């Protein structure tokens, strides 16, 4: 058995999802340890909670992040031995006005550090899929 129970890992992942849904990205960054690492394959590697906060607040307050309010989780796996969560998360744009859905997915690896904090996140995705999704969204929205 690992350091944390499945129940604790599930509870903290539920909070992680709720914080993302709330859209308060500064508060969202508070769920990481002070020395956390965040690996984002397009934007780079962020070391420390404050670096994560600066990046996520900027990214989610400018296009396209500011029009991407929904992050439904299709599935997730709990690795109790390691304290890890692996999830398939959709990044969904707001309704462009015609009811169409524009989204692309990533796989996220989260490593739990205890006390309600994550020490690591890595988002793995195909940037070309995101670019195609954004182009289709903009075509419908008329940007």
Predicted regions and their residues:
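Short, low-complexity N-terminal intrinsically disordered segments enriched in polar/charged residues
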Residues: 1-30, 34, 139-143
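Hydrophobic pocket/interface hotspot
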Residues: 16, 28-29, 36, 48, ...
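Exposed beta-sheet edge and beta->alpha loop/turn motif
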Residues: 88-114
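Hydrophobic alpha-helical core bundles mediating ligand binding, dimerization, or RNAP-core interactions
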Residues: 13-16, 20, 25, 32, ...
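Short beta-strand edge/turn micro-motifs at domain boundaries
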Residues: 105-136
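A short local loop/turn or secondary-structure capping micro-motif enriched for an aromatic residue
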Residues: 47, 94-96, 127-131
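A solvent-exposed, acidic/Ser-Thr-rich amphipathic alpha-helical stretch
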Residues: 6-7, 25-83
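Short solvent-exposed loop/turn micro-motifs enriched in small/polar/acidic residues
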Residues: 11, 68-70, 102-104
